[in-house]
UniProtKB/Swiss-Prot annotation:
Protein name: Signal transducing adapter molecule 2
Polar residues bias (residue ranges): 147-161
MF annotations from Gene Ontology: phosphatidylinositol binding; SH3 domain binding; ubiquitin binding
Localization in the cell: Cytoplasm; Early endosome membrane
Keyword Glycoprotein listed: no
Function: Involved in intracellular signal transduction mediated by EGF. As a protein associated with focal adhesions and actin filaments, it may play a role in EGF receptor-stimulated cytoskeletal reorganization. The ESCRT-0 complex binds ubiquitin and acts as a sorting machinery that recognizes ubiquitinated receptors and transfers them to further sequential lysosomal sorting/trafficking processes.
Region ranges (Disordered): 1-20, 146-165
Disulfide cysteine pairs (residue numbers): none
Every SH3 domain range: 201-260
SUPFAM superfamilies: ENTH/VHS domain, SH3-domain
Annotated source species: Gallus gallus (Chicken)
Homology family: Belongs to the STAM family.
Processing and modification events after translation: Phosphorylated in response to EGF and PDGF. Phosphorylated by SRC.
Residues annotated as domain VHS: 16-143
Length: 468
């Protein structure tokens, strides 16, 4: 890893790992750890400066650099963990284990085993375990987890944390003295006043349950899991405390006195959570899912442009992907509805075409109204020629059954008695009716009925179309 000339950690790292040092300077090491969190791109720059000293030809310098590296991993948080679990560090660590001095190699392997145990629940920090497994396949031996070497490393980490706490207490006392002088000149703020109580006793420590971002100048910013020294807890809602970022006020329900509680497992009464936090929780609730073509297009575009080798997952992309997957059943229902409507319109189209075809067929046929008119004007019938057969319609017996020859006979189940006036009307019918005239009359009525049926079908189709 080449070291940039503008690396702000170069001077401090060289001083902490000087070959003339007889012991570790834990005060300077803690200052470097604090500087990582307060410097932009601090984790990457600090790791570069440390690895430059780990590759030093003097083993004493390399061992001190590894001690500093372990301190940074233990105290600088997740941002430094991700840098240690990068491919660049894994590649360089592989080279150091294979080529460096024996003690340097053993200490680095011990640290890697300790880190793999610490990071085993974090999928983004799995590269350390993968590197150890790969080196074991190549024949490199590593100390077992829980062995004497790793136990010593854990003890060093515990002593390091204790030294850090002592150093933080010392700094807190110094800052408290300065804060007391400045407090008298400051104007009264919107928050409850908090005066510094100076005692020679050890300060009370609490652990942060949630992240808190300072809004006012006199507030204290901290992250979940960090240790805060309480300077004043006289007010029930707002306490005054100190951490490596400075001194300020913070909400008392954001911390706990149990230092062993993990931030993820800690629970807080909802009634104690501020209204702003409640609003943020409500905003985090999933929104109602509906078919959104723009969201699907954007998600596809991001998926096509993303780097598959990037281990940092985009939470927005994951949320968009989940929402798009939830749209699947809704899209299926919409397609079924469209297919059903398409089938209905297809059937209706077939019926309309059949009706139009029947209508055109009937309009092309010319009905014979001349024969039909003869039936309604019997007095104008011309005399029957000798070539046309004449059929007579004799008067039936009193039973009242009359049949016309040439027309389909219909059996009447009950006879009807006719009076003299009805008999006279029947005798006045023309005596000669041709069977072809009756057939034309029946055909004309059938054409009218078909015509009316076609018009009715067309009206129903027009009404159905206007309703849609």
């Amino acid at each position: 890893m080449p070291l940039s000339a503008s690396n702000p950690f170069e001077q401090d790292v060289e001083k902490a790992t000087n070959e003339h040092n007889n012991s570790e300077d834990w005060g300077l090491i803690m200052d470097i750890c604090d500087k990582v969190g307060s410097t932009p791109n601090g984790a990457k720059d600090c790791l570069k400066a440390i690895m430059r000293r780990v590759n030093h030809k003097v083993p004493h310098v390399a061992l001190q650099a590894l001690t500093l590296l372990g301190a940074c991993v233990s105290n600088c948080g997740r941002i430094f963990h991700l840098e240690v679990c990068s491919r660049d560090f894994a590649t360089e660590a592989r080279g150091i284990i294979n080529k460096a001095h024996g003690k340097v190699s053993e200490k680095l392997k011990t640290l890697m085993v300790e880190w793999s145990e610490e990071f085993q629940k974090d999928p983004q920090c799995s590269l350390i375990s993968a590197t150890i497994k790969s080196l074991k396949e190549e024949g490199v031996t590593f100390p077992a987890a829980g062995s004497q070497a790793t136990t010593n490393a854990a003890k060093n980490g515990s002593s390091l944390s204790k030294n850090k706490e002592d150093e933080d207490i010392r700094k807190a006392i110094e800052l408290s003295l300065q804060e007391q002088k400045q407090q008298q000149m400051e104007t009264k703020s919107l928050y409850p006043s908090a005066e510094i109580q100076q005692t020679n006793q050890n300060l009370r420590k609490v652990r942060a349950l949630y992240d808190f971002e300072a809004v006012e100048d006199n507030e204290l910013t901290f992250k979940s899991g960090e240790i805060i020294f309480v300077l004043d807890d006289s007010d029930t809602d707002w306490w005054k405390g100190e951490n490596h970022r400075g001194v300020g006020l913070f909400p008392s329900n954001f911390v706990t006195s149990d230092l062993n509680v993990e931030p993820e497992a800690a629970t807080v009464d909802n009634s104690c959570v501020p209204e702003d936090a409640t609003e943020e929780i409500k905003k985090a609730e999933p929104e109602a899912v509906y078919i959104d073509e723009d969201k699907m297009d954007k998600t596809l575009q991001v998926l096509q442009s993303i780097d598959p080798t990037d281990l940092n997952l985009d939470t927005d992309l994951l949320d968009s992907e989940v929402i798009c997957q939830q749209m699947g059943p809704m899209i299926d229902e919409k397609l079924e509805e469209i297919d059903r409507k398409h089938s209905e319109l297809s059937e209706l189209n077939v019926k309309v075409l059949e009706a139009l075809e029947l209508y055109n067929k009937l309009m092309n046929e010319t009905p014979m109204y001349s024969a039909y008119s003869k039936l309604h004007h019997p007095a104008q019938y011309p005399p029957t020629s000798s070539g046309v057969s004449v059929q007579s319609y004799p008067v039936q017996p009193p039973s009242g059954n009359y049949m016309i020859q040439g027309v389909h006979q219909v059996t009447v189940s009950q006879g009807y008695g006719l009076g003299p006036d009805q008999m006279g009307q029947l005798r006045s019918l023309p005596q000669n009716i041709n069977s072809s005239d009756c057939n034309l009359y029946t055909k004309s009525n059938r054409q009218r009925m078909c015509h009316m049926k076609a018009i009715t079908t067309w009206q129903r189709f027009s009404k159905h179309t206007s309703e849609r």
